[in-house]
Structure formats: structure tokens, C-alpha cells
Amino acid sequence: MSAVVIEPGVTQRQAGKPAFEANKLSKRLHRLVGQAIGDFNMIEPGDKLMVCVSGGKDSYALLDILLNLQQRAPIDFSLVAVNLDQKQPDFPEHVLPEYLASRGVPFHIENQDTYSIVKRVVPEGKTMCSLCSRLRRGILYRVAGELGATKIALGHHRDDMLQTLFLNMFFGAKLKGMPPKLVSDDGRHVVIRPLAYVPEHDLEAWAAHRQFPIIPCTLCGSQENLQRKQIAQMLRDWERQHPGRLDNMASALANVVPSHLQDRNLYPFTTLQATGRADELGDKAFDDDETCAPPGAASVIEAAMPIRWHGQG
């Protein structure tokens, strides 16, 4: 943990507040990550996790939290940190190896010049992120096999998942999000996202507290995905206007009612018949719905029962 310096004229109580807040944040992060791991059975006995570390705040936090949980988890598992050096201009090659070595973490740096490929294929002025991501994914799948990893851990957080949901809804005309656990495209690997319940602002605060050596994600000079950027701003505006809204939306991802949507593949609308029996979950379209009341101070996630994966102390 980073040291807390007491400035002249600052009382002991005032000086202790940053440490108190950092401890609260640490407990919350470890609880939410532990809850996600337990809810989706992300880590099993004997697993070897390949933790993908890009040098951004999210992947640093993921590795940091997993290392802590490894010491107190109810099962044994190992991990190896992997970074893909895509030979972007001015990429500080020394930063991640030095950091990972200082943490005593087994790591592997994969050197692949995908930057040149993307620059050659993508027209000038167009975003390179999509092709870059596909190339990176294929390489990481290969590396996972070579390292004998049983799971691939990625640093996507709650806000990433909500952004993906709305991106697919607004621009893809489908209800599809970003799952916390899935089988890879090639069918050979299980991919997990232990930060699925963690809001981005907590990761920003944790990165500042832990003073991670952040590597900027704009080295390639590519423009950020404009659609995702717009969605992210929309979600931030909603949360500012209605605190707790993002928590509720995140909880809704795990509380789907197919009978009240329109997908005939998920619910037998065409063969539906009256049964003569009352249905507590039936149509309440004309009723006042208590679930539409403003959220309380505590989110659904915060109020969830603890599980044995949760960080202690």
C-alpha cells in the first residue's frame, strides 16, 4: 500500500481518513470480485489463470486483487501474468517487466508486431481498435495453450458490460451484453471477467491509491471507438442524475424475464394457452410496480449475502 504522509497542521484524525477510505475501498473491491468468482464458478481447484495485463488501470487492479485473493482463497490456484507487446510506437517496454518482477509474479511478455499489420490494412483516419482486438485475441488464445493456462482472466468491469449491452441494443438491434464467463471463439479456453461487478470509478480510485505505473492506451494514435465513448458518457450522465441507476441496470443483467420480452426462441409465445390458474409472475402492465421506486442507499450488489470467496479483514 502507498504511504500516508501527515502534513503540518493536519490532525491525526484527518490524516487517518485516507487510510480509512482506502481500507473501505479495498474491502469493497475484494468482496465484489470474490462474489463474481463465486457466483459464476470462475476459478476451480488447480486452475492456472493467465491474467492479461495491458498496463491499464483495470488489468493492474485485476492482477492486484487476484494476488491478494490467492493468499486467502478456499482453493489452490496459480496465475501467470501475460502482456502482449504489439510494438506500438514509444511503448515503454521496461514498465511491465519491472513492475511484475517487483511483485514476484510469474510473467510472460509476448512480442508480436501487430501494429504494422493494422497500419497497413486499416485506411488512414479509421479506428484500428476492432482489427487490433481480433489479432490480439488470437495471439492470447495461442499463448494460453502454450503456457498450459486453464482460464484466461480479462479486466473488463461493470461499466464495460453495460456499455456493451447498450452498444448492441442501439447499433446491433439485439439484447446482448458481455458475459462474465464464456468459452473462447476457438472452443478451447474458458475466459473469465472477475471485475464484472466492479464499477469503473472504484478501479480509478484503486489505481491512484496503489500508484500503478499506467501505460496510456493511445500510443497507436488510433481514435477511440466513438460509439462506445458516447454510450459511456450517457451512462455517466444517468448515474450523476440518478445515483444507483447503474447498479440497478447491472443487477437487471442477472434478472431476466423472457416471458416479458419478445424472443420466441426463449419463450413459447406461439403455443401459449390460458391455464385457469393465477400466475404471480403474470402480466402486471397496468399495476403500480414497486420495483420502479427510486433505489435505496444500498445497491442490490452491496446488499448481497457474502460468500466464502469474499476478502476478509
Curated annotation (Swiss-Prot):
Keyword Cytoplasm found: yes
GO CC terms, sorted: cytoplasm
Domain of life of the organism encoding this protein: Bacteria
Subcellular location per the Swiss-Prot or TrEMBL entry: Cytoplasm
Reactions this protein catalyses: cytidine(32) in tRNA + S-sulfanyl-L-cysteinyl-[cysteine desulfurase] + AH2 + ATP = 2-thiocytidine(32) in tRNA + L-cysteinyl-[cysteine desulfurase] + A + AMP + diphosphate + H(+)
Pathway membership: tRNA modification
Record-listed [4Fe-4S] cluster binding positions: 129, 132, 220
EC number: 2.8.1.-
Class of this enzyme: transferase
Obligatory cofactor(s): Mg(2+); [4Fe-4S] cluster
Cofactor: binding details: Binds 1 [4Fe-4S] cluster per subunit. The cluster is chelated by three Cys residues, the fourth Fe has a free coordination site that may bind a sulfur atom transferred from the persulfide of IscS.
GO BP, one annotated term: tRNA thio-modification
Key words, A-Z: 4Fe-4S, ATP-binding, Cytoplasm, Iron, Iron-sulfur, Magnesium, Metal-binding, Nucleotide-binding, RNA-binding, Transferase, tRNA processing, tRNA-binding
Principal subcellular localization: cytoplasm
GO molecular function: 4 iron, 4 sulfur cluster binding; ATP binding; magnesium ion binding; sulfurtransferase activity; tRNA binding
Sequence motif PP-loop motif, residues: 54-59
General function of this protein: Catalyzes the ATP-dependent 2-thiolation of cytidine in position 32 of tRNA, to form 2-thiocytidine (s(2)C32). The sulfur atoms are provided by the cysteine/cysteine desulfurase (IscS) system.
More details: The thiolation reaction likely consists of two steps: a first activation step by ATP to form an adenylated intermediate of the target base of tRNA, and a second nucleophilic substitution step of the sulfur (S) atom supplied by the hydrosulfide attached to the Fe-S cluster.
Assigned protein family: Belongs to the TtcA family.
Subunit structure: Homodimer.
NCBIfam families documented for this protein: PRK10696.1
The protein's name: tRNA-cytidine(32) 2-sulfurtransferase
Native source organism of the sequence: Methylibium petroleiphilum (strain ATCC BAA-1232 / LMG 22953 / PM1)
Taxonomic placement: Bacteria, Pseudomonadati, Pseudomonadota, Betaproteobacteria, Burkholderiales
